[in-house]
C-alpha cells in the first residue's frame, strides 16, 4: 500500500534567509542559522522563539547542536568558529578555522571532534578536548566544499560534496580521499548517507537539478531522481521512514520512496527557495530552511508496526527487519507496572516491503505485513510467505481464515483460506475498511457494515470513524471518531429475523441492527475489548477502561503508548511505544469478569466471581456497582469505610452507619448520621449522635423541637460548663431562667448586655449590674463610666421603674410554674399581652416591699410565661421525653468549638 504520509506542519517561523537547520535530540528545539548573522532556537511544541545568539554581522551558514556539551557551534562568513553554551547563552570559545567562508559543520557522534568545510576547498578536523586544536586537514577538492556528512554505520568515514562536481569519501587519519564519485554535470551542493543496514547508499543533489543515489561500495550511481526545476540545495535519507527528502531553489520539497524511488509527495509552502533540511533518528519531525524562514513538518504515523497474539508472542518491524519477543520467556520474573520489560529479542529475517502495519489474525497463526501498496501474509512462527498481493488496505475478519482487502477506492475483495471469495463495489466507494464481526467500509457518506458471507448491507451509519473495535463475543463494538467514541450493541438476533422476513429493512440497512449504549467525549488512540470492558489509550496519554457507562483510569502514561493486548492468566495489559519498548500494567481479569457479569445482569455469575477478587480491588468494584444503581450490593462488597458509610446513609441503614461512625470517631460522620436519624424519627439515636459530634446547636434544636424541658435544662448546664455560652444562654432563656441568663452575661464580661437584660426582665437587678458596668468601664474610660446613670439614683431618667418593680414581683409569684409544651396553643403569646397592665394592681408582700425600700436586691425573677399547675400534663409529657440521664456533657471535648465567637465579634 502507498506510504500513508500524513504531513502536518508543526511550526512556521518567519525570519531572514535560513542557511542551516538542526534538531535537538532530546529537547523540542530547532536551531536555525540566518543570513543576517543571528542564530535562533525555536520550541516547536510551544511555537515560541526561546533563544537568540547574535553571532556576527555576516551570514552564518552552519550551526549545529552538541547536546552532550550543551553547546551550539556556529560557522560564519567571517571565517570564525564560535561555540556557545545554549543554557547560559555564554560564548565558550571562538577561533579562526578557515581562510574563506565556512560552509558546513559536522559533529562526530562519539568523539570530541567537529569537521568543518569551507570555500577555501579544505576540510578540517578539530578536537575540543585538545583546546580546539586542528588535528587533521583534508585536501583534494578543487572548488568550494559545500557539505560534509559522517557515515552513521562507520564513524571514522565521512563524505564531502563540492562545487568541483565530485563527491569524495574520506577516512579519519588519512589526508587523502578513499575514492571519488563523479556523475553530476554541475556543482554538488548536498550529500547524505543512508542509515539503514541493508543498503550502502549515498545521496547527492547538485546544480544540474538532479538527485543521484550512489552505491559507495560498488562506486556506482544506482538511481537518478528528476523533477526539480532549479538547483537542488539539500537532499537527505530520513533515518526512520523509507523516504528521501529533497529541497530545491524552485521552492519545493519533494518526498520520494527510498525503495521504489516513486515521488510520494511535493510540498510548497510559498516561502521561496529551499536551502536546508534536517531530520532526527527516533523522530518523524523534519526541519526545512527557506528564504523567508523555517518550517517543521511531521511525516507519517508514529504508531509502530507491532502486534501481539493471545499467547504473548510479539512481532514488530524495525525498518525492514522483523523481530520477535515472547512474554512467556520471562518466566516468573517480577514485573512492575509501567516499567520496561527485559525481553529477549529474536531476529526473524527481513521483509520484502517496508512494513507500515503488522497484525496477527484472531487465532495468532498468521501475521500480515502491509506497506508500499502491498500486503504479505506470513506464518507467525517461522515468517514463511503464505500469500501476498496488492492492496491499499487490509482487514482480518473475526473468522481467522477470512480477510478483506481494499484494492482501490471503489473495489473491496474478500478472501477465504487465501482464495478470493467475493469482490464487490460499495455504493459510495471505499476510503477505508475495518475488520471484525462485520466488514466495515468508510466512504464519503459515512460508515457501512456488510455481512462477510454475502456482502449484504447490515447498517449504514452517518459517522466518519477512525478506528473500529469489536468485542470477542461480537455483541459490542466501539466506533472511534476524531473527537469521541461510541459504544454500540450489535443485535444479531434482530438482524437474522430481518433478513428472513425483510421487515425493518431500508436503503440504509436494518434499522434495529445496533443499539447505542453510550457516547464518550474522549479521543481513542488504540483500544481492545476484554469481555464487555473496552480498554483504550486516550489522546492525553491515559490508560482507561470503559464498562457500563463508567470510565476507570488504570494509569497515567508519561509518553504515547500503543495497546498490544491483554493476557488473562497474567492479569496484565501490555503496551508498546514507538521505540519498541514493551511495558505492562496489572488489570485483574476477575474484576473485569465481575463487571461484565453485572452489565449482563447475571448476578449468580457475579456472586461466583466475587470471592476471587482481592480485597484491595473490592472498593473499585463497589464504586462500579453504585454507578450501575446496585447500592445494596455495593455496600456488601465495599471494603472502604468511607464509601460504606456514604452508601449506608444513602440506603438508610442506620445500624451499619452507626457502627462505622463509632469506628471512625469523626464529628462529621456523627452529624450526618444525626440528620439521617432525625429524618427517620429516631430521636434517641439522633441525640446520641449529636452528643458525639459535640453539636450543642443541634442538641438545642432537638430538645426544643421535642419540647423536652429536662433536656434543655441539662444542656444549659453542660453548655455553660464547657464554655458554649450562646447555647447556654438560649437554653436558660427558653426555660424562663432570666436570672441565670443575667449571671451568665456577668460572668462572661458582657456587662452592657446584662444591663439591658436586667432593665427589660429584672429591674430589681439593674442597680447592681450598672455598678459592675461602671467599675469595669472606668478601667478603660473614666469619663464614659461616670456618664452611666443608675436607675435607682436617677428615677426621673427611667419612667415607670417603680411600676416595673411591682410587675416583676407579680410575675415572680404568679408565673413560677412551667406549662407543658402541648398547652402551647392555649397560651396567649407574650407579644399580645401587656404585663404592665396585668400586674399594676398587684400588692407586693411586706418582705418584698421592705427589700425594695431598703435598696436590697430581690431574688431573681423568671421570664414571663403563662402560669399553670399541671402535674398530670407534666407527668404525661415526661413519659414521652427522651431520658437524658446517660448524657454526660461533662465528658465532651469542646476545645475546638466556640459557638459564640462570631456573635461576640459583631
From Swiss-Prot:
This is Coatomer subunit beta'. One of its GO terms (cellular component) is cytosol. It is linked to Microcephaly 19, primary, autosomal recessive: A form of microcephaly, a disease defined as a head circumference more than 3 standard deviations below the age, sex and ethnically matched mean. Brain weight is markedly reduced and the cerebral cortex is disproportionately small. MCPH19 affected individuals manifest severe developmental delay, failure to thrive, cortical blindness, and spasticity. Brain imaging show a simplified gyral pattern, thin corpus callosum, slight ventricular dilation, and delayed myelination. Osteoporosis, childhood- or juvenile-onset, with developmental delay: An autosomal dominant disorder characterized by decreased bone mass and deterioration of bone microarchitecture, fragile bones, recurrent fractures following minor trauma, and developmental delay of variable severity. GO terms for biological process: endoplasmic reticulum to Golgi vesicle-mediated transport; intra-Golgi vesicle-mediated transport; intracellular protein transport; retrograde vesicle-mediated transport, Golgi to endoplasmic reticulum. It is a peripheral membrane protein. Signal peptide: none annotated. InterPro entries: Beta-prop_COPA/B_2nd, Coatomer_complex_subunit, COPB2, G-protein_beta_WD-40_rep, TPR_COPA_B, WD40/YVTN_repeat-like_dom_sf, WD40_repeat_dom_sf, WD40_rpt. The modification N6-acetyllysine is found at residue 627. It comes from Homo sapiens (Human). The lineage of its organism: Eukaryota, Metazoa, Chordata, Craniata, Vertebrata. It comes from the Eukaryota.
